[in-house]
Design a protein with these regions (language model features):
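Compositionally biased, intrinsically disordered or flexible polar/acidic segments
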Residues: 2-503
């Protein structure tokens, strides 16, 4: 967003005084049509180092790996020397720990699997949490998932208690072998793991051909390698609340709230579907692509053309530079009066490049119209090394002269694609000497009190006009989001870094 968050905040305060909030609280919508639910063939939840069975906080049952066919023999089991009270006991109370390489072997049917690795860095069996540096690989696929990985350094930098890494790997044989190898370059190095999930994945990446963003507005088809591994960096329910794995429509995925990743004060407005609008999946969008709760909520820029033309609705996501990323954007028009083409048309910018001009959700949903989920896949290349800010921005398309100058998004997923050498490796974040900045994960709209009354409304009109005048002088014509005046700070990678902050 150009012009800075202060200017955007003034604009949004003024707009809030003129127009009521668009969120439909407590509305009861018709029962959605989500298609046939996906039932995974393989669904393994392994509580490493534990015996018996236990349920996690989402009600899912995990099996202890003691004596199981998956765990390597004679691998030491350990409990955390002290456990943060915010950390769930399942699967984080126990771990498998070793200073030598070890391999878990899962007999599976062929096909793509979600692989989730759970880590709680603690002192295990008199081993220091800071000494755990290790790699994780899938030898049969020649894929390195993690290298020189430090769960302790990562959680310290992000102020998180535990972390979860999610990958999508393609199994071609009858087994998935997962090898943990301590790093030789670190004294006293060891590897550990608290929990492993292996869940069959629905056909998520072969349904449509992504578009490769070239930067000139002329995207080209991108052929995905069916054998390639991917890492889930972000999975966001835009405009809605977090969705737990038990509420997902396929693969036990977690969907996180998008508010911590919105740039500055330009959060727009979030809302639910109209009571009369049911989410109905078309034939080309299976229900397992995303749950109906994702499509039943949205975030848009708001009702004021002047405000919307002066900023971009922007999310900032931190990723590893030097990789290609598959960005999946979920759309669904869920409120009247957006029922016809060319009512809401907007442009999509990814990593400061034009990915799509003239995006029209109703037109994409033709002939089904309002309440119809659609999604679009884009592949974006990044250069350099280290950790970088990845911008996702939306802006009204003035060239089409739409009825409403606005943009909408319902959900967002970002996947890292493996390099040709099979690497998905990223850097450990560097802990800061200062306390981490507040992520802003609370309800941002609570920062602006309701404004009522004719006098305040009149002041808002004046403020709106003044803000538009000032901001337009400070901003260039609205195109892709440029670099911000200040750094956004290290924000936690959604599924890549876990979900529980330290107390």
């Amino acid at each position: 967003m150009r012009g800075g968050p202060r200017c955007a905040l003034l604009l949004l305060v003024a707009a809030a005084a003129l127009v009521p909030a668009a969120r439909a609280q407590g509305a009861t919508a018709p029962a959605p049509s989500s298609g046939v639910p996906f039932v995974p063939r393989d669904d393994i939840l392994l509580d490493c180092g534990a015996t018996g069975k236990g349920n996690d906080t989402d009600g899912r049952q995990w099996d202890g790996d003691a004596g199981s066919k998956y765990a390597p023999p004679k691998l030491a089991s350990a409990s955390a020397g002290a456990q943060d009270p915010s950390v769930p006991q399942v699967p984080y109370l126990t771990a498998r720990v070793s200073a030598a390489p070890f391999t878990y072997s899962f007999p599976l049917g062929p096909g793509r699997k979600f692989l989730r690795l759970h880590f709680y860095p603690a002192n295990y069996s008199n081993r220091n949490a800071a000494d755990a540096f290790f790699s994780v690989s899938v030898p049969a696929a020649k894929v390195t998932l993690l290298s020189n990985f430090s769960a302790y350094q990562t959680t310290t930098a992000l102020n998180f208690a535990y972390i979860v890494r999610e990958f999508s790997v393609n199994v071609t044989g009858q087994n998935l072998d997962l090898t943990f190898t301590p790093e030789k370059g670190h004294p006293n190095a060891y590897a550990f793991i608290n929990g492993i999930e292996v869940v069959s994945s629905p056909d998520l990446f072969d349904l449509a051909t992504p578009q490769l963003v070239t930067g000139d507005g002329n995207s080209q088809p991108y052929e995905m390698d069916p054998a390639a591994a991917l890492q889930t960096m972000y999975r966001l329910n835009v405009g809605g609340q977090a969705i737990s794995p038990s509420k997902d429509s396929g693969g036990a995925r977690s969907w996180d709230d998008d508010t911590p990743y919105i740039y500055g004060a330009g959060a727009g407005v979030s809302y639910q579907n109209d009571p009369s609008v049911a989410i109905t999946y078309p034939d080309n969008v299976p229900g397992y692509v995303a749950p109906s709760d994702v499509y039943a909520t949205a975030r848009s820029m708001g009702p004021d053309k002047g405000v919307n033309m002066a900023y971009n609705l922007t999310w900032i996501l931190q990723v590893d530079a030097g990789y290609q990323y598959l960005v999946r954007l979920h759309f669904c028009e869920i409120q009247s009066p957006y029922t016809k083409p060319n009512q809401r048309v907007f442009n999509i910018y990814l990593n400061n490049q034009t990915a799509m001009q003239g995006a029209d959700v109703i037109q994409w949903a033709d002939p089904n119209g309002i309440g119809t989920p659609v999604y679009k896949d884009y592949v974006v290349s990044t250069v350099g090394s280290g950790i970088m800010d990845f911008w996702v921005a939306l802006h009204p398309d003035a060239e089409t002269k739409p009825q409403y100058y606005d943009a909408i998004l319902n959900g967002m997923e970002v996947f890292k694609l493996q390099l040709t050498n099979g690497s998905l490796v990223g850097l450990n974040p560097v802990p800061s000497a200062d306390p981490p900045a507040h992520s802003g994960s609370g309800d941002k709209k609570s920062l602006v009190a309701p404004i009522v009354g004719g006098v305040i409304g009149g002041l808002a009109v004046l403020a709106l006009g003044y803000c538009c005048f000032i901001c337009k002088r400070r901003r260039k014509a609205a195109k892709a989001s440029g670099m911000s005046d200040g750094h956004s700070g290290w924000l936690p990678l959604s599924l890549d870094q876990g979900r529980n902050k330290k107390l």
